[in-house]
Amino acid sequence: VKTMLFLGRHVGFPVALEGALKLKELAYIHAEGFAAGELKHGPIALIEDDLPVVVVVPSPNGRPVLHSKIVSNIQEIRARGAKTIVIAEEGDEDVRPYANWLLEIPGTTSLMQPLLSTVPLQFLAADIARQCGNQDIDKPRNLAKSVTVE
């Protein structure tokens, strides 16, 4: 894997950004996070065969319009040959047919969902890092523990 895309909508957008950042820090792979609502305004041009795309799906029990829009995004991504890694609530049958890999999280409130969605992304980044040869994921190269603002 040379690059990965991460998509999220609503509270899932910052989760997508965090997932991309964690993958860059641990596996040294190019990754970008995007707002799913912006997919047709540029990021869709990056979609190609076998490109891994992680999608953070909002709860179907929250705002139904957000859920249906991201299911549509996943369909568009799959139609272009990408491989989808979908993080969704347990029992979300709407996304199952379009997920190459489905990572299920327990159902919760919309504002708590980012906490549950972030953990699988951290494990994913750690696993990919190890597969890429970075066995010391607790000490990523070139990262500072603090930043000095001048």
Regions found by a protein language model. Give the residues of each.
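A SIS-like phosphosugar-recognition module
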Residues: 1-150
